[in-house]
Every structure is written in structure tokens, then in C-alpha cells.
UniProtKB/Swiss-Prot annotation:
This is Glutamyl-tRNA(Gln) amidotransferase subunit B, chloroplastic/mitochondrial. Keywords: ATP-binding, Chloroplast, Ligase, Mitochondrion, Nucleotide-binding, Plastid, Protein biosynthesis. It is found in: Mitochondrion; Plastid, Chloroplast. Subunit of the heterotrimeric GatCAB amidotransferase (AdT) complex, composed of A, B and C subunits. It comes from Ostreococcus lucimarinus (strain CCE9901). It catalyses: L-glutamyl-tRNA(Gln) + L-glutamine + ATP + H2O = L-glutaminyl-tRNA(Gln) + L-glutamate + ADP + phosphate + H(+). GO terms for cellular component: chloroplast; glutamyl-tRNA(Gln) amidotransferase complex; mitochondrion. Allows the formation of correctly charged Gln-tRNA(Gln) through the transamidation of misacylated Glu-tRNA(Gln) in chloroplasts and mitochondria. The reaction takes place in the presence of glutamine and ATP through an activated gamma-phospho-Glu-tRNA(Gln). It is an enzyme of class 6 (ligase). The keyword Ligase applies.
Length: 499
């Protein structure tokens, strides 16, 4: 007798994100960490676990953990403790990892994530189970030696670097949802200046737990952990592959082959590959860290951290929406903290440009220039925010047209300087005198009498031809809206109203 398979399955996904906190020194010793430093040059007896050494908690790490927890709407535990998570692996010099087990620093939070258009474009609330402090392990590199044999080389520079592990509830359902969550979390830690969020360097590492179940069933399926995804796009692909793999096994009657294990994402093969059997909590033999006292936080300490927090991405979105910016522009601006700072500085410049004008140029031509020039962010531009504000205000006021602006912008982006001075030097001020525009229109109509006759015979699409001819005759300096109004009046044979 065969069991009828469900017609539809749904994925149940939770994510554990290891955020590398960018404190100047490690979590429990005074070693500085520098990505790319010579192997094993940023170590000391404490982070290497030598006998007789004692760990001392870095207060900056606690502050960054509180800030992130607060941004995630989590509760901050006034009294917490550290534990030893014990497992044997070559990149763990002490033989255990200092972590937090049953008393995490932060717990019971949530984050609102704007889902991709493909998933409805709605806001989804993702629960945060906990966020706890711990130390990182070292890094293994596998390579062949001169003798042709394979070796594993251990670099302990990263061992002891502070991490905040953020664990979600199993609230996510697709790869795109997980990528959207990860992107929002990265924005938050970057805005807080708590982590650079560089996944390619391991500053933000995501382990995803994936299971599937028939739609409508409460009980979870067997959970599989997926690791080693160095971008959000890779994460989405890995999850979607794993969902399809599990569903195929169930539908083919091989559901018992789905076991609790850790799988790695093979980017070249575009599939997940089994790594090892997944350990349970009992395998780690947690017990309280005897060398570190309980962490007791006063209300004043927590309040001071919260008071020093900068504006978060959600707050910036709300502020920009209130300015009337289109959602697409808001999304581009909030993607980068440097971009937000630059936009705000341009907007508050003495020229007082409109928000929409600044956003339009910044998210369009200027972002394209950054990409083509391979610049990391807008802070590298020769064009200052104040100069951009002046440029946009000139367009707002009709001193130059958008076309002239497009012609001028490349030079401003390459050399910086004042838009007003550049316009004056080139004699490009927009012509907005009604008498000059009227004379210009008269000249164009006189020079194109045949087309004018066709227009008045019903071929009204020729208006675009006349507008283009007027702008060309003025060298692009004529005020387009004024040209349109005066031209229309002339074509219709009605009195000119330029009020």
C-alpha cells in the first residue's frame, strides 16, 4: 500500500548569522585584528588558550551587542553569563569556544523586512529568538605542499575576535525572503558601525536551517543546515536548491535520506553537498565559563548605549517617505549609509534644493558614475554634497535645464567645483525671458512653414518636432516648459500667457 504524497510543500527556514563586531581588539584579550595580516601575527597566550591566562571581557563588544539587540527590538538581559562550548577542531586553539548558552545578552526581538516584489512586496516580521556574544575560531586553509601532499594550514589571527550570533525564529519560507532578511540585517549593523557586513571576508556569515513540510501541517520536517554562502544571491540559490532536493527525495519515496546534517553550498556546481552529521546541544557539553564573572548591566549603562545609537534604516525610510521620495529612490539611498549622509548633506546645503531633485540625480546619473568608475562609495567623489545641492537648486529654479545639467555633471563628478561658476564660464544659463523665447519660437515657425501648415491641417504630432527645433536653436538653453507654452499658444493662434 502506497502513501499518497501531499500536493504541495512549504519550506520552514531559520537563519543563524555570525556578525563580526568591529571592535579595535578581540573579545577577551588585547590583540588587534586585521583582515589579511600575516598568519598568526595577531595572537597572544590568552586567545591561544595557553595555561595560566585569563580572559577579560572587552566592554566595547558589549556595547555593540546592546546596540544591535536594541535595533532588532530585542530585550537586553541585565544579568547574563558566558559558557564554554566544547568541540574539537583544528582551528579552535583552546579546545572550546567562549559563548553564551542559556543566558544570551539579547532575546525576544523582531525585524521588519520588505519582501521582494516576487514575494508580494509586503513587509514581513521575522522573529529574533536570541543574539548572544561569543568568540570566533581561527581559519583553516587547505592546499598542496611542495611535496604534492595535501595540508591544512591554521591561521589563528581570527581566533578570539568578537561575534554576535543572531538567531531567527523559523519564520522564513523562500530563498528570496532569507536574502531580504540578510540584506536588512546587514544595513542595520552597518548603520550602527558595528560590522562592515563584508560577506566575502567573513565579517558576516550565515548558516541557514532548512526543512520542508506539507502545507497546513504544524510539525516541522527534518532540519538541514546549509553553510558557506558568500553573498545573498548565493544564499537564495542554495536555499532554493535545498528545498527542491528535499522535496524530490520525499516525492520519490526516499524521505528517510533527509537527515540532520550540515551541507555546504558548492558555488561551481550550484548545489549543496554533505559535510558532516549535525551535532546536537549535548555534543557540545556546555558549562559555565569559570574564568569570566557574570555580566551585570546597569540601567544607566544600557541607556547610554541606546542614547548614542545613530538613525536606523527603518527611521531613514520613514523620513524619506515623508519627503515624498518614490519608494525606488528610498530603497537605493538606504542601501548605503554613506549615501544617506551625502544625500542629507546635499539637502541641507545653503542652496536648499528639493529632495526629489537631489534623489533623482543621486540615484541615477551619480550612482551610474560610481559603478563605472569602480568607486566604493560617494565619499570618494570630487563633487561635494554642497556642490550637488547648488547644482540641483539651479535646475529647480530654472537657471539651467535638465539637459544642460546632464552635459555639466560629468565634469563636476570628475573635477568637483561649483556648478554656478561652470555655467557662467560656459555661458549656459537657461533662457527664461518670455520675449527671447517668443522670438526663438517665431524664428523656428518661420523657418519651417511647411511643417506648420501640416500641423494646422491636423498633423499635431509635429509639435514635438517644433519643440526640439526650438531647444536646438537655443543650444539647449531655452526653458523647456516656457518653450512648450509659448509654442502651443502660437500654434493655436491664441494670446500668449506666460504668467
Amino acid at each position: 500500500m502506497t502513501t499518497k504524497q501531499p500536493t504541495r510543500f512549504e519550506a520552514v527556514i531559520g537563519i543563524e548569522t555570525h556578525v563580526q563586531l568591529n571592535s579595535r581588539t578581540k573579545a577577551f584579550c588585547r590583540c588587534a585584528y586585521e583582515y589579511g595580516a600575516e598568519p598568526n601575527t595577531r595572537v597572544c597566550p590568552t586567545c591561544m588558550g595557553h595555561p595560566g591566562t585569563l580572559p577579560v571581557l572587552n566592554s566595547a563588544v558589549v556595547k555593540k551587542g546592546i546596540a544591535i539587540g536594541t535595533a532588532l527590538g530585542a530585550k537586553i538581559r541585565r544579568t547574563s553569563k558566558f559558557d564554554r562550548k566544547q568541540y574539537f577542531y583544528p582551528d579552535l586553539p583552546k579546545g572550546y569556544q567562549i559563548s553564551q548558552f542559556d543566558e544570551p545578552l539579547c532575546y525576544d526581538g523582531s525585524i521588519d523586512v520588505v519582501l521582494p516584489v516576487e514575494d508580494g512586496g509586503e513587509v514581513k516580521r521575522v522573529g529574533i529568538t536570541r543574539a548572544h556574544l561569543e568568540e570566533d575560531a581561527g581559519k583553516l586553509t587547505h592546499a598542496k605542499g611542495e611535496d604534492g601532499k595535501k595540508y591544512s594550514y591554521a591561521d589563528f589571527n581570527r581566533a578570539g575576535v568578537a561575534l554576535l550570533e543572531i538567531v531567527t525564529e523559523p519564520d522564513l519560507r523562500t530563498g528570496r525572503e532569507v536574502a531580504a532578511y540578510g540584506s536588512e540585517l546587514r544595513r542595520i549593523v552597518r548603520f550602527l558601525d558595528a560590522c562592515d557586513g563584508d560577506m566575502s571576508r567573513g565579517s558576516m556569515r550565515n548558516d541557514v536551517n532548512v526543512s520542508i513540510r506539507p502545507v497546513g501541517r504544524e510539525r516541522f520536517g527534518t532540519k538541514v543546515e546549509v553553510k558557506n554562502m558568500n553573498s545573498f544571491n548565493a544564499m537564495a540559490r542554495a536555499i532554493d536548491y535545498e528545498i527542491a532536493r528535499q522535496e524530490e527525495l520525499i516525492r520519490s519515496g526516499r524521505g528517510d535520506e533527509i537527515v540532520q546534517e550540515t551541507r555546504t553550498w558548492d558555488e561551481a556546481a550550484q548545489k549543496t553537498v554533505a559535510m558532516r552529521k549535525k551535532e546536537g546541544l549535548a555534543d557540545y557539553r556546555y558549562f559555565p565559563e569559570p574564568d569570566i564573572p557574570k555580566l551585570r548591566l546597569s540601567e544607566e549603562f544600557i541607556s547610554n548605549v541606546v542614547a548614542s545609537m545613530p538613525e536606523l534604516p527603518s527611521m531613514v525610510r520613514a523620513r524619506y517617505a515623508a519627503l515624498g521620495l518614490p519608494p525606488a529612490d528610498v530603497q537605493v539611498l538606504v542601501e548605503d549609509k554613506e549615501l544617506v549622509t551625502y544625500f542629507d548633506a546635499a539637502l541641507s546645503s545653503s542652496a536648499k534644493p528639493s529632495a526629489k531633485q537631489v534623489a533623482n540625480w543621486l540615484t541615477g546619473d551619480i550612482m551610474a558614475h560610481l559603478k563605472n568608475s569602480k568607486m566604493e562609495n560617494v565619499s570618494q567623489l570630487p563633487l561635494s554634497p554642497e556642490a550637488l545641492g547648488e547644482f540641483c537648486a539651479m535646475i529647480d529654479a530654472g537657471e539651467i535645464s535638465g539637459k544642460i545639467g546632464k552635459d555639466l555633471l560629468p565634469e563636476l563628478l570628475e573635477k568637483g567645483g561649483s556648478a554656478k561658476k561652470l555655467v557662467a564660464d560656459r555661458g549656459l544659463s537657461q533662457v527664461s525671458d518670455p520675449r527671447e523665447i517668443e522670438a526663438l519660437v517665431d524664428g523656428v515657425l518661420e523657418a519651417n512653414a511647411g511643417q506648420l501648415e501640416q500641423y494646422r491641417a491636423g498633423k499635431t504630432k509635429l509639435k514635438g518636432f517644433f519643440v526640439g527645433a526650438c531647444l536646438k536653436a537655443s543650444g539647449g538653453r531655452a526653458n523647456p516648459s516656457l518653450v512648450d507654452r509659448i509654442l502651443q499658444a502660437k500654434l493655436d493662434g491664441v494670446p500668449i500667457d506666460v504668467a
